[in-house]
Amino acid sequence: MATSLGSNTYNRQNWEDADFPILCQTCLGENPYIRMTKEKYGKECKICARPFTVFRWCPGVRMRFKKTEVCQTCSKLKNVCQTCLLDLEYGLPIQVRDTGVSLKDEMPRSDVNKEYYTQNMEREIANSDGTRPVGALGKATSSSDMLLKLARTTPYYKRNRPHICSFWVKGECKRGEECPYRHEKPTDPDDPLADQNIKDRFYGINDPVADKLLKRASTMPRLDPPEDKSITTLYVGGLGDTISESELRNHFYQFGEIRTITVVQRQQCAFIQFATRQSAETAAEKSFNKLIVNGRRLNVKWGRSQAARGKEREHDGSGDPGMKFEPVPGLPGALPPPPTEEESSANYFNLPPNGSAALVNISLPPPPGLSGPPPGFGPHMFPPMAPPPFLRAPGHIHYPSQDPQRMGAHAGKPSSG
């Protein structure tokens, strides 16, 4: 019972004819308006070797043309994209997905058994509603903490870039900027990611991308509860402008009674306070590194008490107001403190008590008739003249705002009556 394209054509009823491919968002591209060509029975499926309908399109500007690689039956068996063979729900390789849900692949590998298995699966798909996977995947657990942590929630369009130009690597490319291929240095041939096989990706064996993700999952950080049992608040970051308080409440209410939810739009974060510590620990355990709301992955951490924040400020040196720093060179020295006289506590301009205008103790130039000393002689040997006692200010002036003559403030004349 041969069903391949190069064999006899008597069994064409098992060839696949489809109207639209099964693709992920990354392979479709970011442009919602694409032109897609359809070729009926264009190629053999790279897994089951049956002819199927091939779709070809360009996912965007400066991207390479892509086409479907496996038939829709194989795609539905593994719930993967027909082009990249990554899981449609999590965006992960099949080996990572099967490890997360504890699924063991039991698909046959020989030609006859593979054809028989494919026909039985097609019959099962036809009898189902098409919304759930069939076979062993349909019986596996629906979710896994590891898969939620590793899941790719946003498309990665760099995967659609053109291949590297082999002529440019050899220094022989004459197209320049018009070359449709990338002019970049190729990856190291010894890199495990440089050798990938589509059959290994489908069967979930020897997949270097999956091995890299599984190693990352084994070293992922954990969220330990704080020692202070009075902390029942969780910090949720990365909200963006679309996530509201009601959406956070709809997710976190399942873990226990919520006391308050405070959303800080400016910082794009929220603080969720639970009524009990047990509810907060359950919410932190179930939501750390796997909380996705409206397609956004949110960051969940434990809130900190005021005492812990004060200790952190002391440790960093930012919260100690009495801490002394080294003086900055080149700056003038500090001004002397103002006089501490009890009677002039409210006298901001250092005015005398009788209200007469006070003259400031400002050094004046010498009188016109008195010239400077001749060369070779010292200054005049007489003490400087002091102002009369009734014109002497009670204190020194340290700031321009203390000078009444510069501020335009004059003391009022005493009334004659």
Curated annotation (Swiss-Prot):
UniProt biased composition (Basic and acidic residues): 309-318
UniProt zinc finger (C3H1-type) residues: 159-186
Where would I find the RRM domain in this sequence? Answer: 232-305
What name appears for this protein in its UniProt entry? Pre-mRNA-splicing factor RBM22
Assigned keywords, A-Z: Cytoplasm, Developmental protein, Metal-binding, mRNA processing, mRNA splicing, Nucleus, RNA-binding, Spliceosome, Zinc, Zinc-finger
Q: What is the lineage of its organism?
A: Eukaryota, Metazoa, Chordata, Craniata, Vertebrata
Q: Which source organism does the UniProt entry give?
A: Xenopus laevis
Subunit and partners: Component of the pre-catalytic and catalytic spliceosome complexes. Component of the postcatalytic spliceosome P complex.
Task: Write out the biased-composition intervals (Pro residues).
Answer: 369-391
What's the entry's take on its domains? The C-terminal RRM domain and the zinc finger motif are necessary for RNA-binding.
